[in-house]
Amino acid sequence: HLVNAGGIHYEPFGLYPGTETSLDNIDNATIAVPNDTTNEARALLLLQDNGYITLKDGVGLTATTKDIVENPHNITFVELEAAQVPRTLPEVSFGVLNGNYAMEAGLTVADDALLYESDDSEAAATYVNVIAVKEGNENLPKIKALVDTLKSDEIKQFINDNYNGGVIPYK
């Protein structure tokens, strides 16, 4: 049985510009989101966390567009296979992308994302990359030393310098 010895980093979802380059233009916008359950929920939570929509209480990481209870900006959602979202950016106002698809499209969180998941978001806490060890070994000195090293300021700086926000050190 494996357990979490420590969270190290996560890859944030981001909202990227399409035909619009500013969130000042979000009224009546069309936003492309991934259509698979996990990624669609992350996209919707990103928008909720930033005050653009409200989801039903408790849906969390199972949210779909059917769970939107308030949409004050009259946003239209286009649900697509995640790999298709970057290709549709010229045709939609904005798109919410997984980090890997953003990088493949030449986009970076640091330079291009208008919004991205914070390290205290539900998604970051759920999808953080961890050091997994056999249960009972999580408190061994060598495991603690490994986790401490991977969470050190030096490693955090390396991540920040090399991944343009596509990978973010976890708190």
Q: What residue ranges belong to the model's regions?
A:
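A local structural motif
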Residues: 27-29, 52-79
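Short amphipathic alpha-helical coupling segments at ligand-binding clamshell hinges
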Residues: 27-29, 138-149
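Ligand-binding "clamshell"
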Residues: 1-5, 20, 91, 96, ...
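A bilobed periplasmic-binding-protein/Venus flytrap-type ligand-binding module shared by bacterial periplasmic
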Residues: 12-23, 127-140
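A conserved helix-loop-strand patch within extracytoplasmic ligand-binding domains
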Residues: 1-53
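Solvent-exposed loop/turn segments at secondary-structure junctions
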Residues: 21-22, 37-39, 83-85, 100-104, ...
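Short helices/loops that flank or line small-molecule/ion binding pockets
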Residues: 45-46, 66-101
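Periplasmic-binding protein-like
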Residues: 41-48, 150-170
